[in-house]
């Protein structure tokens, strides 16, 4: 009897040791299940598990079930989740240099996106770590366009619309209001119902997300003009990261980078495919004239002083303007 009891105790002790080594990383994202961004996380989790002999396991919370991106950052800080796959909207809560990606019409080619990101690499990565988080991989998800319930071609047209802005981003809301626009702050998870009820009638968003959320059924007009570039990152809080064995950290970083590079190479051009699919189901792609595009550029030039210190952090804005001049001289 004593031998049996001893055997049971030994088995329980060994089982506890085995499970004690396992680290479960809870990671949230707004991306719905079945999207490419969600698929990247699934692949990431499987590869991490294989590379760490099952000691690191990724538990994914998709579709905004944890809340908006600001909610994700808050919950990471208090330990409810450990990681997130988020856009620059969430990253600006951690690192003000991500506000540089808010500059409208700054980027018109992926060459320009790569140029700016390369020049800002040190600030983007190091400042994030200084604030308690580690970037595992950083990619751009694609171009941002204006989607609306009625056609819009000019800034004056946009003034007739109720514009989605992120809940909590009061600086963008104030900036829009100052220049005569009608911003409506909401959580991204409430966008579909907001369009259905008429609370919102326009949004600047990436076509892949519009397709995934079926927003084009209501916001069935797209202005074919690159308004911005959606940058995203997969991050983990440093407290969790530092619990992981250093040899596994190296493998996990390599896996994250490889998967991120592969995702970007493929999905930089998925936006065009998403637009094509939506066109088959009634999306109207409205092409602005060169004169109309000039009006948009003039708007950005006029608003530029107001971006500094509001939507875009002062130091980040000044750094971006230096990079912009350098980029234009190439």
What spans do the regions from the language model cover?
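Sec-dependent N-terminal signal peptides
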Residues: 4-14
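Sec/Tat signal peptide C-region and signal peptidase I cleavage site
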Residues: 14-20
């Amino acid at each position: 009897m004593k031998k049996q009891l001893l055997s049971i105790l030994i088995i329980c002790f060994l089982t506890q040791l085995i499970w004690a080594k396992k680290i479960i990383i809870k990671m949230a994202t707004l991306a719905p299940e079945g999207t490419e961004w969600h698929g990247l996380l699934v692949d990431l989790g499987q590869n991490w598990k294989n590379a760490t002999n099952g000691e690191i396991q990724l538990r994914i919370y998709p579709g905004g079930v944890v809340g908006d991106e600001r909610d994700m950052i808050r919950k990471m800080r208090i330990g409810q989740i450990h990681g997130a796959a988020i856009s620059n909207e969430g990253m600006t809560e951690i690192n003000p240099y991500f506000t540089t990606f808010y500059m409208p019409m700054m980027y018109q080619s992926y060459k320009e996106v790569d140029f700016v990101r390369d020049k800002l690499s040190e600030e983007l990565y190091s400042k994030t770590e200084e604030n308690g988080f580690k970037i595992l991989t950083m990619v751009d998800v694609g171009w941002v366009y204006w989607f609306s319930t009625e056609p819009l071609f000019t800034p004056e047209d946009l003034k007739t619309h109720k514009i989605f802005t992120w809940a909590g981003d009061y600086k963008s809301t104030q900036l829009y209001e100052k220049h005569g626009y009608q911003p409506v702050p909401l959580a991204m998870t409430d966008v579909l119902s907001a369009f259905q009820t008429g609370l919102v009638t326009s949004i600047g968003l990436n076509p892949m997300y519009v397709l995934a959320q079926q927003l084009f059924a209501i916001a069935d007009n797209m202005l074919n003009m690159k308004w911005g570039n959606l940058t995203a990152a997969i991050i983990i809080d440093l407290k969790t990261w530092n619990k992981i064995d250093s040899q596994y950290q190296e493998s996990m970083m390599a896996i994250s980078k490889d998967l991120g590079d592969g995702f970007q190479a493929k999905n930089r051009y998925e936006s065009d495919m998403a637009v094509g699919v939506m066109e088959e189901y009634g999306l109207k792609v409205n092409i602005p004239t060169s004169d109309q595009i000039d009006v948009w550029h003039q708007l950005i030039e006029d608003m530029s002083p107001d971006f500094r210190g509001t939507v875009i952090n002062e130091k980040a804005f000044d750094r971006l303007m230096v990079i912009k001049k350098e980029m234009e001289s190439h």
